[in-house]
């Protein structure tokens, strides 16, 4: 029997839990998010628990990741962005480890589900909105009226800018989920063809499969970066009212 390429995204209950009328069951998605968090914490613990003047390769790799996120905030927000390093760094690492964990055979890609990515996007959206109002008060609403807009065009621009602002969590979450799902479906389909082709071409299709896996790993890293850089840009709008 041929399995559907979409079967890999099925949510399966492991522990059925009902709380206050809500289904909060522990699923395969839950366990892989927990596993990604544990792996991330273990990685950074091993990298930094015994820091040395001459760093190990593990410490160097962890410092590169940290500096990457710090540079993103610095380039987009400036010095004011340093206080958001814990939030943005946690987002980047969580998404990165979830994406990469999903590349292992017979695993589950949590970031291919819109409910997971939308939750992360809503976290960014609420943070940006709260920071904007706390820092600027009602002046934050000027974000919806670009500077220099003619008075007669102001109502239309406000509606457009407000719609664009409210659409941010949707576009942010859909981009990540769609890319991760599309990549894994493509790999599943091509892997099926590769097995069939090996009957006639022996091991020749394997290099092609390895290239595609390498490309998908690149996409997994890139999508974590894109989600994070867009989060930094949204924070910049709230802090500097651009």
UniProtKB/Swiss-Prot annotation:
Pfam families: ATP-synt_A (PF00119)
Primary residence: membrane
Membrane-spanning ranges: 29-49, 84-104, 114-134, 140-160, 189-209, 210-230
Keywords in alphabetical order: ATP synthesis, Cell inner membrane, Cell membrane, CF(0), Hydrogen ion transport, Ion transport, Membrane, Transmembrane, Transmembrane helix, Transport
Location of this chain's protein in the cell: Cell inner membrane
Membrane topology qualifier: Multi-pass membrane protein
PROSITE patterns: ATPASE_A
GO MF term set: proton-transporting ATP synthase activity, rotational mechanism
GO CC terms in record: plasma membrane; proton-transporting ATP synthase complex
Keyword set includes Electron transport: no
Keyword field contains Transferase: no
Subunit structure comment from the entry: F-type ATPases have 2 components, CF(1) - the catalytic core - and CF(0) - the membrane proton channel. CF(1) has five subunits: alpha(3), beta(3), gamma(1), delta(1), epsilon(1). CF(0) has three main subunits: a(1), b(2) and c(9-12). The alpha and beta chains form an alternating ring which encloses part of the gamma chain. CF(1) is attached to CF(0) by a central stalk formed by the gamma and epsilon chains, while a peripheral stalk is formed by the delta and b chains.
Family membership: Belongs to the ATPase A chain family.
Function: Key component of the proton channel; it plays a direct role in the translocation of protons across the membrane.
Protein name: ATP synthase subunit a
Annotated organism of origin: Rickettsia massiliae (strain Mtu5)
């Amino acid at each position: 029997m041929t399995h559907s390429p979409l079967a890999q995204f099925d949510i399966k209950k492991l522990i059925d839990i009902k709380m206050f009328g809500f289904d909060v069951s522990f699923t395969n998605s839950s366990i892989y998010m927990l596993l990604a968090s544990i792996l991330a914490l273990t990685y950074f613990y091993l990298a930094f628990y015994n820091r040395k003047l001459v760093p190990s390769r593990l410490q160097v790799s962890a410092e590169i990741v940290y500096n990457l996120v710090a540079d993103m905030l610095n380039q987009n927000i400036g010095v004011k962005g340093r206080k958001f390093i814990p939030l943005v760094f946690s987002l980047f690492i969580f998404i990165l480890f979830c994406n990469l964990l999903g590349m292992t055979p017979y695993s589950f890609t949590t970031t291919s589900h819109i409910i997971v990515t939308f939750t992360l996007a809503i976290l960014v959206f609420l943070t940006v909105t709260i920071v904007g109002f706390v820092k600027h008060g009602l002046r934050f609403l000027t974000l919806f009226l670009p500077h220099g807009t003619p008075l007669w065009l102001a109502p239309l621009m406000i509606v457009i800018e407000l719609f664009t602002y409210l659409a941010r969590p949707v576009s942010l979450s859909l981009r990540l989920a769609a890319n991760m799902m599309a990549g894994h479906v493509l790999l599943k389909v091509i892997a099926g063809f590769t097995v069939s082709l090996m009957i006639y071409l022996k091991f020749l299709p394997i290099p092609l499969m390895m290239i595609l896996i390498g490309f998908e790993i690149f996409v997994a890293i890139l999508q974590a970066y894109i989600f994070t850089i867009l989060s930094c840009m949204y924070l910049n709008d709230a802090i500097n009212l651009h």
